[in-house]
């Protein structure tokens, strides 16, 4: 259709299918198998489902972006054979700068298995060359779980502390504060700092590759779950392949 500046990914679609609520298109799909496209964007969460959830509180650039989606699609589908646009298989898709990538859901599991085979192969080679030791491999759990546990705990209890310090936050209908983006940025920076510190303290340069194995293993486990239960997020296997390239 020649849409400019597409921004989307199939994870959004998979999560949408898991939600209990429907959209305006649901009745058309269920009653007449009539296909459609949902447009959605998220920002200024504090306006969502409030009296301020109107066009006056939307960014003009965001509305213009929706128009850039709508007009080419109207032109395309008004001239298309609608009997030939029925999809036979869902696809994984995501945006990267200057292009839009997609591939069938059926590729997700094989891509995960292939990544797993390469992971085991590199692990075997590293053990054979005495680059890896089981002792150091398992010690890699210390900075990994330490970073996850401390960052997760500080984020959870930090937010609880903010709710205690500012009880008026509990009155917000959607739970997103007016300075919510600042809180998100602060907690992200805090989490990254904790991660860097944990690996600085517990992962000496000579054993970094050993500790890297556990990070890749966790990513492999996550992608195994994704391949089975959240296929739309299948593109998250791609960072694993880059990790394997560095690993190899």
Regions found by a protein language model. Give the residues of each.
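Proteins with a high burden of low-complexity, intrinsically disordered sequence enriched in S/T/G/P/A and R
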Residues: 1-7, 12, 17, 90-92, ...
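A sequence-level detector of short, solvent-exposed, charge-rich linear segments
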Residues: 58, 70, 89, 112-115, ...
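Alpha-helical transmembrane segments of integral membrane proteins
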Residues: 117-248
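Cytosolic-side membrane-insertion boundary helix
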Residues: 85-116, 131-137, 178-183
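Soluble extramembrane regions of membrane proteins in the secretory/endomembrane system
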Residues: 1-103
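Short, surface-exposed, charge-dense and proline/glycine-enriched linear segments
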Residues: 38-52, 71-74, 109-125, 203, ...
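Generic structural signal for well-ordered, non-membrane alpha-helical segments
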Residues: 21, 59, 63-67, 114-117, ...
């Amino acid at each position: 259709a020649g849409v400019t500046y597409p921004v989307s990914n199939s994870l959004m679609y998979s999560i949408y299918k898991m939600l209990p609520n429907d959209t305006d298109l649901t009745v058309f799909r269920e009653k007449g198998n009539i296909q459609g496209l949902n447009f959605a964007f998220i920002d200024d969460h504090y306006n969502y489902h409030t009296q301020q959830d109107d066009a006056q509180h939307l960014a003009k650039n965001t509305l213009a972006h929706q128009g850039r989606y709508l007009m080419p699609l109207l032109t395309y589908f008004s001239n298309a054979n609608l009997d030939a646009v029925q999809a036979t298989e869902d696809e994984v898709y995501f945006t990267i700068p200057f292009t839009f990538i997609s591939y069938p859901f059926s590729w997700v599991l094989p891509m995960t298995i292939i990544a797993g085979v390469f992971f085991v192969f590199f692990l075997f080679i590293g053990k054979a060359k005495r680059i890896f030791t089981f002792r150091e491999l398992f010690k890699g759990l210390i900075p990994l779980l330490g970073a996850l546990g401390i960052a997760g705990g500080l984020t959870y209890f930090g937010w609880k502390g903010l709710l205690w310090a500012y009880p008026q936050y509990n009155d917000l209908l959607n739970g997103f504060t007016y300075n919510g983006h600042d809180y998100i940025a602060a907690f992200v920076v805090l989490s990254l700092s904790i991660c860097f510190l944990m690996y600085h303290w517990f992962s000496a340069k000579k054993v970094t590759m050993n500790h890297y194995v556990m990070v890749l293993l966790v990513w492999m486990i996550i992608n195994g779950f994704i391949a089975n239960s959240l296929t739309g997020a299948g593109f998250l296997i791609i960072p694993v392949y880059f990790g394997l390239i560095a690993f190899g």
